[in-house]
């Protein structure tokens, strides 16, 4: 059993913790919280050992939470650390704590790529994390783009270039201090946005340019993609590539999927925890080919899309399972869509 320590028990960290619990080859060593808030109390109620920073121990005790130890105690108790801290805090933790211990660490996409030896996406470069000490699971948007492009190339559909336009959610549902509320904000106003270069940390030879705006929604991101293929492919072949690829979901307007809100409602109706939707939701009706040009729209659930990637990254680091066996094991354990998917 791989002992997993999770630093940061917020939007991503708590979901990774639940995903680890669902595995039969991993277990939670503990989670780190810096504030004794309701999330810390939820972690305690889940039976997770809760650790904190040295200067926060007394604050936790006063709040009625007895810490299991400090961050360094958590590192020592873990075989691997998943750092799900806010943006840039992961790098600070690396410099202050992780470098002193011979333990692998998985960072999230909020960190710059050079925090790790390799950027990771299970479909695209699972094997590259093998034996690495520092691995970075790329961001939600980068994960979505990488999955879509890789699903094509894995199924014999070649890509010459990709131009992706992103309508980013303004904030996560719980983020009451973020926006916009009544605006559309270039994010950034310069071209390209950081997503394209981030994709290239995994798909190194892809010609890609991305642009992004932030919009006043909280549920998901929407991507609008123009992809130039290496030749003309039938639309049915492209759709079949998406249909066979794990972690891609084809949403049909005729089945009631007319918006991203309905994708999330579907997740809730399935009984998925928190209404999560880790798959990329490709709108089948949007998939259009014109000669060697491909157009499509797809949704990315920012709160959960990277969760299965973190589980696979753990197995890749330790070499416990080959690529497709790990992806299938993760998908089944998290009850993702597996019907009709090809694992290998």
Curated annotation (Swiss-Prot):
CDD domains: GAPDH_II_C, GAPDH_II_N
Top-tier EC class: oxidoreductase
Assigned GO CC terms: cytoplasm
Gene Ontology MF term list: 4-hydroxy-tetrahydrodipicolinate reductase; glyceraldehyde-3-phosphate dehydrogenase (NAD+) (phosphorylating) activity; glyceraldehyde-3-phosphate dehydrogenase (NADP+) (phosphorylating) activity; NAD binding; NADP binding
Binding positions (NAD(+)): 11-12, 110, 169, 302
Record's subcellular location: Cytoplasm
Residues engaged in binding D-glyceraldehyde 3-phosphate: 139-141, 195-196
Protein name, as recorded: Glyceraldehyde-3-phosphate dehydrogenase
Organism: Pyrobaculum neutrophilum (strain DSM 2338 / JCM 9278 / NBRC 100436 / V24Sta) (Thermoproteus neutrophilus)
Record lineage: Archaea, Thermoproteota, Thermoprotei, Thermoproteales, Thermoproteaceae
Name of the gene: gap
